[in-house]
Amino acid sequence: MMKRYFQGFKALVQTKTASTAIVSIACVMVLAACSSGSKRPQPAELTAVTPLVAAPQLWTSRLAPITFALQPGVANNTIALASDDGSVVMLDVLTGRDVWRMSLATPISAGVGSDGVTAAVVTKANELVTVRNGRELWRQRLVSQAFTAPFVAGGRVFVLAADRSVNAFDGETGRKLWTQQRPNEPLVLKQGGVMLAVGDTLVVGLAGRLTGLNPLNGSVRWEAPLATPRGINDVERLVDLVGGIYRESDVVCARAFQASIGCVNAGRGNLLWTKPANGVQGISGDSRLIFGTESDGNVIALKIADGEKSWTTDRLRYRSLSAPVVAGRSVVVGDSLGNLHFLSRDDGSLLNRLTTDGSAISINPAVVGKTLIVVTRSGGVFAFQPE
């Protein structure tokens, strides 16, 4: 009975609670630039494009600016978003209208988890807060910071904290149910990580591993390494799994920061393949290919069967790309100037380019049904319907 209940569950700053330092992507990029001793490369110039796929804009909405690692919460034709000022909103994907909107009046560090009814965020004061129908349901103090959106499923709220603990709370009352503490590392990435459900297993990214947990008690069912820490310093050894994954049935594919892309059979808990890849953003995919953006702006496609490279394009080099997302015939990436680039899934050729509000698209774009939703750093929300 309980198993069915969970089925489909479908700048360095020192932390106060552990001897773990938090490092942002910007910090890593600055350190890399300093070590290379060279100037930052100039972004590739954008060439004129003849639109080969249509992507009409459906609606827009607006939030306050967003500087934390927002992970949109998608469920049941809704998308839940949040902004720096503590605003949390659930939008109807079809119309862009507010289902509800409220303010927690406190800055947010992680969010938004949503099952379409309950939304959950973590504040900079290390509080887990749940919201339902635009009203605060409960809040609980956490012992550590969190940068990954809470995961809401099966009547529970799960939190991956910066000390690499996984915590489960009762969705109605906020009562803590269990904590699973895994071995810590000297550094943790200040970026959204990986949490999802595959069948009756909670799958979490812990350091360079995908780990399967029993959602009822937190016990470990399996671990599959996507990357092993290497290098001469803690920054080079940082291999946290980053948010933005691809899942097809029991197969889950993810990126290890600066290290690799790999796929795991989460039903059996075994590694299928892993390939070196030097990127910092999440991935996307379809039934044939896994798509990623590398640190230098190259966009790559790997075969999902074995990880071998299918194609790569350098037309967007050094444009500070977002994670990709598959939308219609295209794989779509955003850049630091608010452009959306539509590339062919077959060969990476340019199919279209759209603009938003001119601010960076560093938040992973989302697809809900046939609707592509893009959120910018200045708080603009744009919905398109690509062919």
Segments (PLM) and residue ranges:
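C-terminal motif of bacterial Sec signal peptides marking the signal peptidase cleavage site
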Residues: 30-33
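Loop/turn-rich, solvent-exposed surfaces of beta-rich toroidal or solenoidal domains
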Residues: 293-300, 308-342
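Short loop/turn segments that connect beta-strands within beta-propeller blades
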Residues: 92-95, 132-135, 170-173, 215-217, ...
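Extracytoplasmic beta-rich repeat domains
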Residues: 37-73, 100-116, 137-153, 176-199, ...
